[in-house]
Each structure stands twice: as structure tokens, then as C-alpha cells.
Amino acid sequence: MAANDRAAAPGKSGGSSGADGLMRASLSAVAPGTALRDGLERILRGNTGGLIVLGSDKTVEAMCTGGFVLDVEFTATRLRELCKLDGGIVLSSDLSKILRAGVQLVPDPMIPTEETGTRHRTADRVSKQVGFPVVSVSQSMRLVALYVDGMRRVLEDSAAILSRANQALATLERYKLRLDEVAGTLSALEIEDLVTVRDVSAVAQRLEMVRRIATEIAEYVVELGTDGRLLALQLDELIAGVEPERELVVRDYVPEPTAKRSRTVDQALYELDALTHAELLELATVAKALGYTGSPEALDSAVSPRGFRLLAKVPRLPGAIIDRLVEHFGGLQKLLAASVDDLQTVDGVGEARARSVREGLSRLAESSILERYV
């Protein structure tokens, strides 16, 4: 198999988060443009079925009876021809070799499964028992199903996936446009020191919505393989800087810890991620995830940023210097009022860097105000 035709080997699952990662790796291994996907499509076109285990270890070997050992290089045509035999096929863990063919796979019959067909029931049980992905090709239904540690995914053709992906991309473009609007408003309000919890929650809400739709599109990119290259480029362009912005907003506004309530940046990001779609639509719930009380009245409470987000927009300013500036001055308003001499009192900030920070903040302040009122 040519190196550029082979996707990364999926490996074995390791818990719920591991199963999700294994599913993504497995989808990548069977995506259009890979030799394995080519072989699966040849099986469908030949109107035959197949049962293929994507990996091997002692557990898989103990489950196999009959058939014969091959240990030959994987090719799409070999896979197609060997699937004409009764029985399953076992590939090496890196998908580079066909190890066995024509084998009968005998998983534990006590493993529960909701599948009905013999081939699909076997595939589901084998994947659960051994931890490797298993592909089942149905001759009668003409579909390919991927089983990964209790999860099932039917492989679709690129046209169907692209249709959904393009709809999601159009939604992402609208979300990103709205995000840019509320983020610009927040910047202007920060300069004027007029920010409320509602303003912060609106930006955090939009950032999370953009992140979620981008994650969905990224899944489509994985499934599309080589057919998703253009989609991947569009996605990268649209979400550039979104993830860092999300963390910067939280770092700017997560409340200072008190005796009754304390929340770290990581905790706030986790809480935002854990919100359901319905909860994300409520600004009060978003505010609560950030660490505020979440009452409707609290949304109009005034808050002040620490300055991480605006300082990150200053060119060529290292993160370590940003942290020192925020720690020294304590808030954005004091940073905006600081002179070049004041800035030089911070460790690591010389005259040239102090002038760069001073001029950068001044330009950001002017442009933010102009964008809001002009």
C-alpha cells in the first residue's frame, strides 16, 4: 500500500473519551482517498459482503477459528478478492497487512447487541470485546457500517456528507459574523469601562456556538478524507483565533474567588462546554457558567476586564509579558492610563516594548470607539 494512501492506524479504545477519539481515527482510516475505503467500495460494487477487523492482538487471534494465515501487504484489490470467501478478514494494527482471511470470528455470545443481521451482530460484539474497530459490509443492504466500542456509524458517500457540511458552513459564517459584531462592541465598552455581565455573556455565548458548529464541521472533514480538503481550508479561515479568544474572554472576566464562590479559568471553560444547546441560548445560564450568580438582575451588573484580551491584540507581545502587565496593573483601565515610564516598571518591559504597548493600546482604543460610533 502506498504511504500516502494509508490513514493513521486507529488502534484500540480506552474509555469513553478514548472511544470517541478511536471513532475519529477509524473514520479517518476509512475516509475517501484511503486504500481501505477503495477496497470497501470495490466490495460494494462487486455485490459481496465482508467482515473486517482493523487490528490484531492475542485476543483477536484467540477469537479466530478456521481460515488461513496470509501476512501479506494490504491492497484494495486483495481485500476485494478475499471478501469473496466466507468468513472475516483480520488486518494488522497499522492497516498495512492482511494477516488472516476466511476466518470465523467467535465473540462472547453474552455481549449485548441490538443488531439483527448475523454479520452486524458479530461485528458489534467483536468490536466491544477486543477494542479494535470492525467494518461490516452488508451485501443485501449495500451499506458499510463501522463499529467502535459500542458505537455504530454508517459510512456515507461524499455527496451526502458535503451537502450537510455546506449547510453547517453557511451557519458558521452567520455565527462568525454575529460574533465579530458582539466582540467589537465588547472592545468598545471595555475602553469606556461600561461592560456588564450581559455583554460578556453574549460574547462567551457566541464563541461557544461558533466552537460547537466548527467541531461538527471538523467531523465532516474527517469523514470526507481527501474530498474534504477545500472544506478544511474554509473552516480554518473562519475559526482562526476563536479558541484563543474564548480563553482570553474567560481569563478577563472570571470572577475573583470569594468565600462562597470560586471558579478557575479551566472550570469556567468546562462549564461552558457542558451547557446543553437550550442552556446556551440563555444568557443567565452562560453567566452562571462563567462564575456569576446567573440571576436576571445580575446580568446588568458592571464588570471590568483584566486586560488579557486587548493586550493579546498588541503585535509581538509575548504571553509572559502580558501576564506580568496584568498582574502589575490589575485591570485594563489602569493599563490604558499607564504612561511609558509606568509600563517600564514591569519586569521584562524595556523602553521600546513599553512604547509598543502604549501605542498599540492607543490604536486599539481609537479603532474600537470609531467602529462603534461611526
UniProtKB/Swiss-Prot annotation:
Could you tell me the Gene Ontology terms of the biological process aspect for this record? DNA repair
At the top level, the lineage of the source is Bacteria
Q: Where is ATP bound in this sequence? A: 87, 105, 118-122
| Pfam families to which the protein is assigned, alphabetical | DAC, DisA-linker, HHH
Reactions performed catalytically: 2 ATP = 3',3'-c-di-AMP + 2 diphosphate
Under which EC number(s) is this enzyme classified?
2.7.7.85
The answer to whether the entry has keyword Aminoacyl-tRNA synthetase is no
Task: Please give the cofactor(s) recorded in the UniProt entry for this protein.
Answer: Mg(2+)
Residue intervals of the DAC domain? 20-158
- Give any GO molecular function from the UniProt entry: ATP binding
The alphabetized UniProt keywords are: ATP-binding, DNA damage, DNA repair, DNA-binding, Magnesium, Nucleotide-binding, Nucleotidyltransferase, Transferase
- The reply to whether Ribonucleoprotein figures as a keyword in the UniProt entry is no
Report the protein's function. Answer: Participates in a DNA-damage check-point that is active prior to asymmetric division when DNA is damaged. DisA forms globular foci that rapidly scan along the chromosomes during sporulation, searching for lesions. When a lesion is present, DisA pauses at the lesion site. This triggers a cellular response that culminates in a temporary block in sporulation initiation. Also has diadenylate cyclase activity, catalyzing the condensation of 2 ATP molecules into cyclic di-AMP (c-di-AMP). c-di-AMP acts as a signaling molecule that couples DNA integrity with progression of sporulation. The rise in c-di-AMP level generated by DisA while scanning the chromosome, operates as a positive signal that advances sporulation; upon encountering a lesion, the DisA focus arrests at the damaged site and halts c-di-AMP synthesis.
Oligomeric state and partners?
Homooctamer.
Q: Which family does it belong to?
A: Belongs to the DisA family.
- Could you identify this protein by its name? DNA integrity scanning protein DisA
Species of origin reads: Streptomyces avermitilis (strain ATCC 31267 / DSM 46492 / JCM 5070 / NBRC 14893 / NCIMB 12804 / NRRL 8165 / MA-4680)
Q: What is the lineage of its organism?
A: Bacteria, Bacillati, Actinomycetota, Actinomycetes, Kitasatosporales
Quick one: which gene encodes this?
A: disA
